[in-house]
């Protein structure tokens, strides 16, 4: 299997990611909110500026060779509690179900523990997103609870 790398997201990589983006209906609990994605250069710039200026967040491009295939964030980084949350989104169906997300999540957990000094990483998925739940469990996250919309997971050092 080809090797995945996490690279600090740049504005250029962010545009490359979203030029080929497809919204995934499986991550929408309320289908009234689902709309096909249409690339908008100004919107991507605003997104990158907003996320990139957040000191409690690390934004990564998921790289397959020199091609960006997804985005991963370590967010809500709390150095006092030594916890953060993981968020991942793959670009489109062509890169899903191939183990790339699993590799990326493993790298992110290693980064959180080894580089950021975190003791725990949290994650959540909407209840119907069984694919994401399976990947989290495969990486070592444990089910921590649920509510009407989300299932919550946690991995500790």
Model features per residue range: what roles?
Residues 25, 35-36, 52, 144:
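Residue-level detector of secondary-structure transition/capping positions
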Residues 26-47:
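Conserved GNAT-fold acetyl-CoA-binding loop/helix
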Residues 1-16, 20-26, 59-157:
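Acyl-donor (CoA/ACP) binding surface of acyl/acetyltransferases
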Residues 40-45, 51, 71, 135, ...:
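Short amphipathic alpha-helical patches
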Residues 49-50, 111:
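Short, flexible, glycine/charge-rich loop motifs used to bind or transfer phosphoryl groups or to couple energy/partner
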Residues 50-56:
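Short loop/turn motifs at secondary-structure junctions and domain boundaries
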Residues 38-40, 55, 155:
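A short hydrophobic/aromatic micro-motif that marks alpha-helical segments and, especially, helix-coil
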